[in-house]
Structure formats: C-alpha cells, structure tokens
Amino acid sequence: GEDTTDEAGAGSTDGVPQAGAPLKVTYHDACFLGRHNRVYEPPRELVGSLPNVELVEMPRNRDRAMCCGAGGAHAWFEETRGTRIADARIVEAASTGADVVATACPFCSQMLGSASGTSAGFVSANAADQGGANTDATTASPGGKLPEVRDVAVMLLEAVKRGQ
C-alpha cells in the first residue's frame, strides 16, 4: 500500500484492519498536549468515533498519565539501569488488552513504537547488550503480545481512505 508515514514514525496503511474488523484501542496522553495544554478529550473523541473501535483506558491516563520516556532528552540516550520508561508504558497499555496504542505525539510514537517493536524508535535496538538496562517489554506483557503504536491522524486518514 501507499506509505503515509514521515520520519516521525506515524505509520503506514499496510496491514490496516479492514472495515468491520473490531479494534481495541487505548490512547496515550502525551506530556505536552496533555499535562501542559490540558487537551485530553478531543483525541479520545476522534479515536472513539472511528468505526469498530472500542476505546479502553490505561490505569494511568489524562492528568495522571506517565511519560513515554522521551521527556528531558531521554530519547537520545540509553538507560544504564532499571526499566526503560517506554517499556513500562507499553506493558501498561498491553494490560488493557488493546490491539493499538494511539497517540498524537511523534516523540511518543517513536518511544512507544520502539518498546513495542513497531518502529525503530530513537534508541538502539541492542540497548540490552549495553549493560542489560533494557527490560524486554514482550516478556513482561500479558500473553507476551504488545499493541501496535499508531498516530491518531494516521488512524483517521485510514478510515477516510476506506470510505468510513
């Protein structure tokens, strides 16, 4: 299919669920859009209005949501100990049973996509080889399945292209 992505990792239309396929989606509140600008409901309204989407909430959401891990320039360096923030957040998303984590922030898309294996992300893929700091989110998630990370705007575009 035609690639609708840019370098921010917004996604592509390949593998998009066809009309009628049920999709469980959880929304990740980005720090700047959410906590800084207090925009919480419009992205949820948009995602929830897409056909066949069931919107589910993570335990920490809206003003209590956790960062994706990119804040404070963390996107550009490897964690040297403990669990990567993005790994912890993607496991929280997986706990909802969601097929997709939707976000409206390119940094969050990259960080969470890296943790879920759905994009290259900002950090190297072999962070675990550099001191064992990278907890494998797949083994920590329920059933070992991680949700795909998608940009809200791309999800809307896909629905428009399907004529929904």
Features from the language model and the residues they span:
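Iron-sulfur cluster-binding electron-transfer modules in prokaryotic oxidoreductases
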Residues: 1-164
